[in-house]
UniProtKB/Swiss-Prot annotation:
Residues 128-183 form the HTH cro/C1-type domain. Pfam families: HTH_3. This is Putative HTH-type transcriptional regulatory protein Saci_1344. It comes from Sulfolobus acidocaldarius (strain ATCC 33909 / DSM 639 / JCM 8929 / NBRC 15157 / NCIMB 11770). Signal peptide: none annotated.
Length: 305
């Protein structure tokens, strides 16, 4: 069984400054914390051999997540039960064995993520797009070679994703192993994610506020929704309009729009999609949605009247 001393020795061999936390004597959530080094290596918050009851395990995970949010550090549980070269994740906290930690500290890529659904491979979205464009390969061509939808490939390139081992092997065969990502290096703390989510939320509010202003000026009655597929409805006389904004990924946006279309068809309303950019609007138009980009919201009233 790996010990705190084992981990400390590994950190020392890699010239990483660390402190062992000795309080409390039992039921600790943090055993070791490291120091950030020249912005090249993030802070690590480590718990060693977390073989605790489910209830205490939840509390330990919660503590690790909280300090990660405050420091933008990487929370890690060092667990002998995890296979070599594999990372397990629960509630935003990673688990790996000592060998995998050693490989990561040497700068080697750690790209296998184990979940309840199986083992998946991290993809580097920027590198994937770069390699595809170098080969002058379209999204459609790549999707056919991978055996996935064009929307899936678009999402792979938009945001670092996890793919099946089968898809990863095909990507390596086509582009080389540069397109494979690194779970540890690419880790975003919850703080950063929250900032990104808040930014997305603020952008959605901005879109809906502008839309509401344009429609109200044209004498439409508007209502907003928070917990369904549609974001806003507008009524003027017998005319009924339903509006949807984009969400975090293209695939989720299309799912949202398709569900909103079910509502629109049942109440005899016209569904209008508001896209953030002309690039995504073209994708939605190919799926036969009526689309306006944010800068053209003023045209909604003119073309609906």
């Amino acid at each position: 069984m790996v010990t705190i001393s084992d981990v400390a020795n590994l950190l020392s061999r890699n010239t990483i400054n660390y402190s062992i936390i000795d309080y409390p004597e039992k039921k600790k959530s943090i055993d070791i914390i490291t120091e950030e080094q020249n912005d090249k290596r993030r802070i690590l918050v480590l718990k060693i051999n977390n073989s605790t009851s489910d209830r205490r395990n939840f509390r330990i995970l919660f503590d690790l997540k909280k300090i990660s949010e405050v420091t933008e550090s990487l929370p890690l549980i060092i667990d002998d039960n995890i296979e070599d070269d594999v990372v397990s994740e629960k509630d935003g906290v990673f688990s790996m064995n000592l060998y995998t930690l050693e490989r990561s500290l040497r700068g080697e890529k750690i790209f296998l993520l184990k979940t309840r659904g199986g083992i998946f491979v991290r993809v580097d979205s920027k590198k994937l797009r770069e390699k595809r464009e170098e080969k002058n390969m379209s999204l459609g061509e790549l999707s056919q070679r991978l055996g996935v939808s064009r929307i899936s490939v678009y999402d792979y390139e938009k945001e670092d994703s996890y793919v099946s081992i089968e898809v990863a092997e095909k990507l390596i065969e086509i582009f080389g192993d540069e397109v494979i990502g690194d779970i540890i290096k690419d880790y975003d703390s919850n703080t950063k994610k929250k900032k990104e989510l808040q930014s997305d939320y603020n952008e959605e509010v901005k879109i809906l506020e502008k839309l509401d202003r344009v429609l109200s000026d044209a004498n439409y009655k508007t209502v907003k929704f928070n917990f369904t597929a549609i974001d806003m409805a507008a009524i003027k006389g017998s005319e009924k309009l339903i509006f949807c904004t984009e969400v975090n990924t293209l695939a989720n946006s299309l799912k949202k729009f398709n569900e909103a279309n079910k509502i629109a068809s049942k109440i005899n309303a016209k569904l209008l999609v508001i896209a953030k950019s002309s690039k995504t609007s073209k994708v939605y138009e190919k799926e036969n949605f009526n689309v306006y980009i944010y800068n053209d919201i003023d045209k909604v009233v003119d073309e609906s009247s």
